[in-house]
Regions:
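Mature extracytoplasmic domains of secretory-pathway proteins
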Residues: 59-121
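Bacterial N-terminal signal peptides that target proteins for export
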Residues: 2-9
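Hydrophobic helical h-region of N-terminal Sec-dependent signal peptides
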Residues: 10-14, 18
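C-terminal motif of bacterial Sec signal peptides marking the signal peptidase cleavage site
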Residues: 20-22
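N-terminal export/targeting and maturation segments
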Residues: 24-83
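Low-complexity, intrinsically disordered terminal/linker segments enriched in charged
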Residues: 114-145
Length: 145
């Protein structure tokens, strides 16, 4: 009976620690304070991706993206991060695609922190591991097939 009580108490304590760890109020406040509203999210993301590539000298005709991970990733007090696969078509029809990490800033938009083109990932497949979480790296590798 005593053994059962100890196991029960450890299960309760473990569940409590898990709940506390997943309800970090600081992380929640950073996400709420920086991620654009659902109504503006997609428009801001497309706008800021287009600006990033335009600033690199690409005359943008269209930008499309796919989320590589749903929702924001919050680490410490940094801006919340999002991970997308992007397809950029220029005005002459050339396509550029790759993996992007973005930071959501002040609910007003996104800043691209890292871009890895499809060709750069193919030439150095481990390069993404320093920037993207392991589950996101797996999704990126799926895109390369």
């Amino acid at each position: 009976m005593r053994h059962f009580i100890y196991e029960f108490l450890w299960a309760v304590v473990g569940a409590g620690l898990l709940m506390v760890g997943s309800c970090n109020p600081i992380a929640t406040s950073h996400i709420e304070g920086n991620v654009p509203s659902p109504e503006t999210f997609s428009g801001f993301l497309e706008r800021d991706l287009a600006k990033y590539f335009s600033d690199k000298g690409i005359g943008i005709a269209s930008v499309k993206y796919e989320m590589l991970r749903e929702g924001a990733t919050q680490t410490g007090i940094a801006y919340p991060k999002f991970y997308v696969w992007v397809w950029v078509t220029d005005k002459v029809g050339a396509l550029q695609e790759g993996a992007v990490r973005l930071a959501a800033i002040d609910r007003n938009g996104f800043a691209v922190t890292d871009f890895f083109s499809r060709s750069s990932i193919l030439s150095d497949p481990t390069s993404i591991e320093a920037v993207f979480p392991k589950p996101v790296c797996e999704k990126i590798r799926e895109k390369l097939k």
